Amino acid sequence: METTLLFKTTLILTFELSIAFGLCIYFLKAAKKAALSGKDFFGIHFTQAVNMNNELDLIPDPTRSIEYPRKMSKLVDKPEYKWKNPKKKETEWSVVFAANREEAIAYLKDGYEDEMDMPKPLATTFSLWILSSFALLISSIVPPYEYYLLVGMFLFTFTNICLGPVLAWIMLMVDENDGIRALKITLIVTFLAGFIGYSDFYSFAQNEYLALVMFLLLLGLVVFSLVNLFRGFSRGVSRAVAIGGATLFSLYIIVDFNRLIYLEDLNINDWNTAFYMSYTIYLDIINLLLQILDAMSNS
């Protein structure tokens, strides 16, 4: 019996999200267990605190995981003889190495910054996630070939194995309790949006005007995020934009599930298409989760 495109897409999507979210929850639970026993986990030590809801809140404490000598740096003015333009002041990075904690504190007071914000095991995982995500993106948009599905699924799975710890780190930096709540909200919104999109009471995927508006809003969200890296907006503005971003990605989930009906009407029902659609919806869901986390962190 031939399965539907919806079944194939949902099967792949559920499998991959189970890996990412499952590992994320495992890392959060393991981090809590390690913190309660005074040990580190994945190269990270934690300080125990209590949030406003009287819940245990783990705060990553990278200073307890630092090895010496410790590289530190700060931006300083160049000597005048090094200026390329005699009339224009120039700067350069001054790098020092602290031999112990006392020296590191002294350098911090002098304006030097610690470059070791993320523990090495996590930094390695994050780098692998970036590389595999880029490779996955490329593999999903190239024309289908003999091993399209095999290569795509391998990269998809490896990417989510790396994403799990990264998501856990993001949640720990905010509040893992809010992170779990954001995860639950994401799953509920995804289910409702998928149901609305696949019920086909309106052809969202074929509305060109809606697609254009959503693309422009997405472009605006990207521009805002880039500007926010350098300028820094108020918490209220950031929260409002994050809520808008969550709404936008919820709409994308509706549109992409609605597109499945359109493809089925064209008698397109193969695993390559299911892989591509599952990856597209997956991106919507991950971005939805990140926007919800951003909104919670700025509340």
Per-segment meaning from a language model:
Residues 1-299:
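A hydrophobic alpha-helical transmembrane-helix feature that marks the membrane cores
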